[in-house]
C-alpha cells in the first residue's frame, strides 16, 4: 500500500497513487508494499527499496548510511502486538531528490497520529527533512506518554507488592511488573536508536536553521527522557527484589513450620518405636498401664520441644 502526500498551502495532503501524482509527492509512505508497487517506484521514480530483512540489521553501518539511492535511516518505532505486548517495528527512511520514502510492515501509532495532525498543521520549510523530523518528534512524544503510563502503573504495583500480602493481586502484580520491565527496555532501545539516527542526520546533512534547531530540540528531549526511563528500571528492579524477598520470607515460614513439626514428633516417634518393639522376657510388655504410659510419654515428648521453642521465640 502506498500513501502519497504532497504540499498544498503549506500542509500535507494525500494524493492518488497514479504515476503522475507520485511525481509531485514529497512523502511516499509504503505500508507492506507489493512487488508491483516496488516495481512502479523503481520504474517511475528510480527508487529501489530495502527488504524487510535488511531492516533487522542492528549495526550502525547498516542502519545509517548514504549511497546513490539517497540518505538512509533505519529507526525503531514503539508499538504493541496483537496481544497488547510491547513491541518494536523498524522503519526505513530514505531521502532522495527532495522526497521522503518510508517503508514499514505494520501500522504504527506515531504515523497515524502524524497523519491526523498534518491535516491542520502547517509546515515551515515544506521539505522532506521537516516531515522526517516531525515523525521523529511524534515518536518521542509517544515514548514520553509510555514512560508516564509506566510510572502510573508502578505506583499501583508498589502498593500491592509492598503490602506483602501474597494473594491473587500479588501474583498479578508480578506478571504486570515483568511486562513493564520489558516495555521499559524497549523504550530505552527506541530512545537510543533515535538518538543515533538524529546524530547521523545532523552530521551528514545541511539542515536549514529551523530544522537544525528542531533536531537539536528532539535530541534534548531524548536526553531528558533517558534518566526517567533509567529510574523506571531501578524501580522495577527494586519492586522485583522486594517481591522476591516477601516470597522467600513466606517460604522460610513454611520450611520453619515443617522443621518444627518434625522436631516435635521426633521424640514421640522414638517413644512409639521403643514401645512397639516386641522382645520376650521384658517386664514392660506385661505392665498393665504400659499403653497409656507410652501415650503420655509421646504427648510429653511432643509438647516439651514445642513449649521450649515458644519460650525462645522461634514460633
Swiss-Prot record:
Subcellular location: Cell inner membrane
Residue intervals passing through the bilayer: 257-277, 289-309
Keywords: Cell inner membrane, Cell membrane, Ion transport, Magnesium, Membrane, Transmembrane, Transmembrane helix, Transport
Motif (Probable selectivity filter): 276-278
Record carries keyword NAD: no
Catalytic reaction(s) noted: Mg(2+)(in) = Mg(2+)(out)
Topological relation to the membrane, as annotated: Multi-pass membrane protein
Keyword Transmembrane helix attached: yes
InterPro entries membership: CorA_cytoplasmic_dom, CorA_MIT, CorA_TM1_TM2, Mg/Co-transport_prot_CorA, MgTranspt_CorA/ZnTranspt_ZntB
Annotated site (Essential for ion permeation): 252
GO cellular component: plasma membrane
GO function terms (MF aspect): cobalt ion transmembrane transporter activity; magnesium ion transmembrane transporter activity; nickel cation transmembrane transporter activity
CDD domains assigned: EcCorA-like_1 (cd12835)
Similarity annotation: Belongs to the CorA metal ion transporter (MIT) (TC 1.A.35) family.
Domain comment as written in the entry: The central ion permeation pathway is formed by the first transmembrane domain from each of the five subunits. Mg(2+) binding strengthens interactions between subunits and leads to the formation of a symmetrical homopentamer surrounding a closed ion permeation pathway. Low Mg(2+) concentrations trigger both a conformation change within each subunit and a loosening of the interactions between subunits. This results in an open ion conduction pathway. In addition, this results in a less symmetrical shape of the whole complex.
Assembly notes: Homopentamer. In the absence of Mg(2+), interactions between subunits are weakened, and dimers, trimers and tetramers can be observed in vitro.
Role noted for this protein: Mediates influx of magnesium ions. Alternates between open and closed states. Activated by low cytoplasmic Mg(2+) levels. Inactive when cytoplasmic Mg(2+) levels are high.
Matching NCBIfam families: corA
Protein name: Magnesium transport protein CorA
